[in-house]
A protein has these predicted regions:
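Dynamic helix-loop-helix/coil hinge segments at AAA+ ATPase domain boundaries and subdomain interfaces
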Residues: 1-17
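AAA+/P-loop NTPase substrate/partner-engagement loops
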Residues: 6-9, 55-88, 95-100
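Pre-Walker A adenine-sensing motif
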Residues: 13-28
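Walker A/P-loop nucleotide-binding motif
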Residues: 29-51
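Conserved AAA+ ATPase "SRH/arginine-finger" region at the nucleotide-binding site
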Residues: 64, 128, 137-138, 145-161, ...
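Conserved catalytic/switch belt of AAA+ P-loop NTPases
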Residues: 83, 99-149
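C-terminal alpha-helical "lid" subdomain
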Residues: 174-234
Length: 234
């Protein structure tokens, strides 16, 4: 069981609410969407999914983590879970494709609702640092056509967008500012039994500069380090 609690996550309340509401609908047997969570690294995308499992496991929620290369086995996975009473989230973490890979094609087919790759008790939740799951290149902009005042993306861009558009719910995440970062640090320090102080805040900012990021993950790692160094000996 994942130990992450939704209540531990800071600065992403709106994102939590959207994903949790969709998940509750799914657990209750109501219509719900496949979900794509995109944005900056370390901002809580995968933590939300794991926190949902922690919160709703007793209500029948289950998580199946799948690497992108294993997405070709989707029909077999669906066959294994179809008819079971639990509600399954097929979870693809940090998903990025670099072309028409087998996993890309399999996922596209599943999101299209192919009978062999869908079940009423299974949804696909994916996280990615790329909004459209694939790298974007400057040269692709040269394919753009202009018809009057309208802009028409080229075929390459259209193909890349086509996969992400198949997810019914998009949830975006953004980098934290300094105050949000320090709030997350304070939350994790409390979690580890330490109190925030002027010294810890100063060290936390130095830590983030060294890491080149003020993400939730960096805040968590700092809090573990600080709490460990300043914990009273037992």
């Amino acid at each position: 069981m994942h130990r992450i609690k939704l209540s531990d996550l800071r600065g992403i309340d709106k994102q939590i609410d959207r994903v949790e509401q969709n998940t509750k609908q799914f657990i209750d047997g109501k219509p719900a969407n496949n979900v794509l969570l995109t944005g900056a690294r370390g901002t809580g995308k995968s933590s939300i999914v794991k926190g949902l499992l922690n919160k709703y496991a007793r209500q029948g929620l289950r998580l199946i983590e799948v690497e992108k290369n294993d997405l070709v086995d989707l029909p077999m996975i669906v066959d294994q879970v179809a008819g079971r009473p639990e509600r399954f989230l097929l979870f693809c973490d940090d998903l990025t494709f670099h072309g028409a890979e087998e996993g890309y094609i399999a996922l596209k087919v599943a999101l299209d609702g192919s009978i062999s790759t869908t079940s009423e008790n299974l949804l696909i939740y994916a996280t990615s640092n790329r909004r459209h799951l694939m790298p974007e290149y400057m040269a692709e902009n040269l394919e753009t056509r202009y018809v009057g005042d309208e802009i028409h993306p080229g075929e390459t861009v259209e193909e890349k967008i086509s996969l992400s558009e198949r997810f019914g719910l998009w949830v975006s995440f953004y980098p934290f500012d300094q105050d949000e970062y320090l709030d997350i640090v304070a939350q994790w320090l409390k979690h580890f039994g330490a109190a925030a102080s002027d010294a810890s805040r100063e060290e936390a900012l130095q830590w983030s500069l060294q890491r080149g990021s003020r993400s939730g993950r960096v805040a968590y790692q700092f809090a573990r380090d600080w709490a460990g160094k300043h914990a009273k000996k037992k």
